[in-house]
A protein has these predicted regions:
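Cofactor-cradling patches in redox/metallo enzymes
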Residues: 20-122, 127-130
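N-terminal pre-triad scaffold of radical SAM enzymes
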Residues: 9-13
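CheY-like receiver
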Residues: 135-136
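Short, flexible coil/linker segments at domain boundaries that flank nucleotide/cofactor-interacting
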Residues: 1-3, 83
Length: 136
C-alpha cells in the first residue's frame, strides 16, 4: 500500500509553529509522506498545494482563533475543485462547540492542546484504511 500523503499547514498570521512541526515529524515517523507549508499560508495557498501535491489529508494548525473562518474556507476551495475527498483535520485552541460545528460542515476530527500525536496518527491511518476499502 502506498504511503499516506499529508499536507501540514499554518494558515493565517499565527507565528507559532512548534506544534505543527511536532505533528509533521510524528506523521513522518509513522511512515506518512508529509509536506509542511510553513507559516502564514492563505486558504487559497493551502488548497492549491493540497491539489498540486495530490495529498490525502490536510492538517491545519490554528492557534489564532480564526478556525471558524479558515477551516470552512479550505473546505470550500477544495470542494470547488472537486477534491472534497481530501480529509481536513487539524487542531489548536478550538472550543468543543466550534469543533462540533466544523465537523457538521465537513471537517474530520479536530484535536485540542495536549492530544498525544499517536492519537492523530491512529485517526489518519484508520480514516485512510476506510477510504481505501471504499475505493476497492
Amino acid at each position: 500500500m502506498r504511503p499516506i500523503r499529508v499536507l501540514v499547514a499554518k494558515p493565517g498570521l499565527d507565528g507559532h509553529d512548534r506544534g505543527a512541526k511536532v505533528v509533521a515529524a510524528a506523521l513522518r515517523d509513522a511512515g506518512m509522506e508529509v509536506i509542511y507549508t510553513g507559516l502564514h499560508q492563505t486558504p487559497e495557498m493551502i488548497a492549491t498545494a493540497a491539489i498540486q501535491e495530490d495529498v490525502d489529508v490536510v492538517g491545519l494548525s490554528i492557534l489564532s482563533g480564526a478556525h471558524m473562518t479558515l477551516f470552512p474556507r479550505v473546505l470550500e476551495l477544495l470542494r470547488a475543485e472537486d477534491r472534497g475527498d481530501i480529509l481536513i483535520t487539524g487542531g489548536g485552541i478550538i472550543p468543543k462547540e466550534d469543533m462540533d460545528a466544523l465537523h457538521a460542515m465537513g471537517t474530520g476530527r479536530l484535536f485540542g492542546p495536549g492530544t498525544p500525536t499517536s492519537e492523530l496518527v491512529s485517526y489518519i491511518k484508520a480514516w485512510f484504511a476506510e477510504q481505501s476499502q471504499q475505493r476497492a
